[in-house]
Each structure stands twice: as structure tokens, then as C-alpha cells.
Amino acid sequence: MAAIESFDNIYLDLSKESGKSRFAENGLGWKPAGGGEAFTLDSSNIGGAQWSRAARGYEVKILLRSSGVVQLDGFHQEDYERLSKIFKNWYSVNLENKEHSLRGWNWGKAEFSKAELTFNVQNRPAFEIPYSEISNTNLAGRNEIAVEFAGNDGGKSNGHSGTGGKGKKASAGKDQLVEVRFYIPGTTTRKEAEGGEAGSDADEEEKNAVTLFYDTLIEKAEIGETAGDTIATFLDVLHLTPRGRFDIDMYDASFRLRGKTYDYKIQYDAIKKFMVLPKPDDLHFLLCIGLDPPLRQGQTRYPFVVMQFKADEEVTLDLNITEEELNGKYKDKLQSHYEQPLHQVVAYIFKGLANKKVTTPAKDFTTHRQQYGIKCSIKASEGFLYCLEKAFMFVPKPATYISYEQTQSITFSRVGGAVSALSTFDITVHMKNGAGSSQFSNINREDLKALEEFFKLKGLRVKNEIDDDTNLIAAALGDDDMASSDEEAVGPKADRGSADEDEESVDEDFQAESESDVAEEYDSNHESDGSGSEESDVDNRVDDEDEDMDDDEGEKRPKKKKKTA
């Protein structure tokens, strides 16, 4: 055999770009054809090899001694003999020829191996799932388990380090499989779940099959406690998004949310924003964690995790870290002992472990009640809007973050025809480049001026349609008053006279063209503008006569007879 064996057009770990693969006595390597980072694997780390049909021809799957899998796809059928000699002579490993099941059945047996989960149909593999591709698993029903896959890793060529350690596969396409569910009824033992002989140990306890599958997968895929030592744990923390109560386990590189139904494992690298927001009730604080990629629960995505803490809840906590780590890796980031309000402790630990800045509301804005949160709603969902230094933040659901840099303009408006139109208003935030808009409704009118001043302070374009509408309405009302003031004055007041007076007395001195108001007819002391002294004397005499007539009528008017049964 030659000192080096080369193969062209080979794909590493489902990568989109092909490359050249070279085998030598001390190991193997792969380099992309277009240039880039090369992958190498030492011969001492090769624990086994399998040959099978794959997407681009034939595939060599290399099982690593350090719990991992390397896939090389794109070989031709005639390469089998050549590769078999390479693995046998140089790596002392047999290249096992494995045939996949092509029956298309969706029922079979799951087998946990060292590096991957295999679904077998009639003792042949239908598909395999490397543990490194599994990001999370949850019990989705009574006999059902959901297995979630790792998302796009940001376009890296492969997830392996130079020594072939555990890592994600090549960057995925725009559309990719994100979840698979297994229905596992009945009971079983741990040995059966791992592919052992049933009944080999009489003392082996039977458990629910789906629960045992779940526990085994968590252990194999290193999800949860097996991912490392817990630095801190917070129990029964209320989460508004996703809704429920979760225990928070914080590790060196990730944290875990453990609930009754769902568990989430989140890398600190996925944290893009971290905010501490006081609720307007002065009793609670909200901790908002922005994630990219977002948290996924079935078909629902959660770009923000929103926790709620009581403002007066104190905690005493000692971190599970050594003095050496505290003075080295976490110097000036963490303390060994905390005795403070719970929300502050959680925020400090997240800041130290994730190395993220903690964002709080801007000091330049408060509501008319001297609060930072504005009560409002997005469509039918009520919540609170916070003005940060560089963005808006609406919580709890749907949690919405809008950067000032992406804001084109802001419009203040009032809902026409609404009963509360005079006491509330709406804010519409228009995004740049036609990215749409977001509307925040039912904001207290007393916060209008403070918001307008804050937006102008931040250099945002503001259009106040409320003032424009008010001016137009005032102008329209002013014209109507000028045009109909006389009619409105005479109309309703002319009917206030006495019926007896209308029938029995005629005002002979009334002039239709007179400008005097009807009030003059009843007010003896009223002086009509523009009338002479003679007209005043006449009016006074008429008033005196009317009074005398009223007195006479009062004396002559008989009493009403009482009805008798």
C-alpha cells in the first residue's frame, strides 16, 4: 500500500461542500476543496468503522473512542476493498458492511450505542441519530417522547475540533429536521432498553418504557445534570414565557430549566440580551433573557425567556466553585457567597457566567406615577412597555424587542369612536426598510407628554396625530357654534313658558325682529343690548302687568277636586 491514500469529492459530516480525504498510517484528514479549516483524526481515536449506502453514494462511518461519530460520504462502490485494507492494516479495525432497512416501516426497536441512537427494523438500521445532534428531549405525552435536534451552528464547516471531540455536524440548510417523536408503550427494564437480554437479572426493576427511554437518552446525550457540576440552583421559579414553574440549574457553559413537563438546556452563547425590569406594581421584578436561536416547544418559538421574582424575596447562596476558579476564571465576575434579593442574585450569576451586560430601563423616562413600565397592550395581549436606553421592550407576551436604530418613526394616535378615546392613546412604531410596524394600544393619556419628550431626546421622528385631530375638531366646533348659536339659544328655551300664560295672555309688545333673548320675557331686571329707554319702560310695564295677572290667576284658580271612589 502507498504511504497515503487519497479520495476526491468526499463530504464530511453532511457538509454542503466537498473536499479531499487522505488516509495515512497515523490517521486521516479532510480539507474542503474551496479552502478552509482542515479536519484531522488521530489513528488512536478510531474505535470502529462501518460501510453503508448514503445520500451521495457510499459512506464510511467512523466510531470514535472518545464517544463521537465521523461521517465521510461520497465514496464509490468499488472503493470498498481499498478502504477495507486501509482500516485493517493501518488502524486494526474491520470495515463492517451494514445494510439499511428499506421497508419503510415506522415501528421497530431503538438501540443505544456508545455514540448514537439507532432505530432498527428487523435487525437492520433504518436511521441513526448521533447524540451530539440532540439538543433536548421531553416527555410529550403519556407514552410519547420528543427528541429535539441542534439548530444551525452559524455556518461552520464542521463541528469537530482537531482531535475529533464532540460537536455538532456541518451547517444545516434553510429547512431542516428539528424534532422527531417516538411512541413507546408498555414497561421494560434498563437492560432491555439498552439492547441487553430480557430477564437476565431477576432483580431488575420494571419501569415505564417511555420513562426509561427518556432517562437513558438524557444520560447518553449528556442533557441535564450529567453535563457537569451545578454551580447554582434556584427552585420553583415562576416563568411567564414559556408559562410555568421551572427549576434553574446553572452550569459552567449552559443552564437548564427543569419543569414538570418540559426541560430545556440552553447554552450561554445563545444569550444575546439580559434585562432586569421592575413591574409597575412595585412588588415584582422581571428578568428577560433574549435567545438566538430561540427556545422551541413543539411548533412554538420563544425568543425571550421571562422570569418573575418577588421584590422582597431574599436568598442566601454559596456557589459550588473552587477558590482557584473564583480567583482565576471568574475573577471579578462572581462571588462565593450571596445574601441579597433573589432577583439580584440570579442577575449577577447570569452576568458572571454568560458574560453579558445587564440592561435596565432608561433613567430619562418615567410615567405619571413615577414608574418605568407603561401599561398597554399588543392586540388582545396586555403587558408593559419599557423604554430602554437603546430599544423598546414589551413583556411578557408576546415579548417584543424593537431597537431605536431600526425605528423609522413613531406615531401617536387615538382610536376613533372609542369610549376611552379621551383618556388613552396608541403608539405605532414604524420600522426602517419596510420591515413593518408594531402598535401599542390603550396607553394612559397622562404619559403622552413624557413619552414625546423622551423620543425627541433619543432623536426619533415623532408624529402627533392626537394634537392634529384636536385642533381640527376644535376648529369645526367653533364654526358650528358661530353658525347655530342663535337657533340653539331660542329653540330649547322657547318651550319653557307657562301653558296657561300662552293661552290666556298675549304679549302685544313682542317684536319678531327684536334681538332681545327670550330670557328678557321673564327677567324684570334684564337690560337688552341696543334697546332705548322707551323700550325698557314698555318692557317693565309688560312685566308688571304679567305679574299682576299671575297673582289674579292664582287667586281665581279653583282648587282641584279630589277623586272619590
Curated annotation (Swiss-Prot):
Keywords associated with the record: Chromosome, DNA damage, DNA repair, DNA replication, Nucleus, Transcription, Transcription regulation
Location in the cell: Nucleus; Chromosome
Cross-referenced Pfam families: PH1_SSRP1-like (PF21103), POB3_N (PF17292), Rttp106-like_middle (PF08512), SSrecog (PF03531)
GO cellular component: chromosome, telomeric region; FACT complex
Cell membrane in keyword set: no
Physiological role: Component of the FACT complex, a general chromatin factor that acts to reorganize nucleosomes. The FACT complex is involved in multiple processes that require DNA as a template such as mRNA elongation, DNA replication and DNA repair. During transcription elongation the FACT complex acts as a histone chaperone that both destabilizes and restores nucleosomal structure.
Protein's name in the database: FACT complex subunit ctc-1
Organism: Neurospora crassa (strain ATCC 24698 / 74-OR23-1A / CBS 708.71 / DSM 1257 / FGSC 987)
Gene: ctc-1
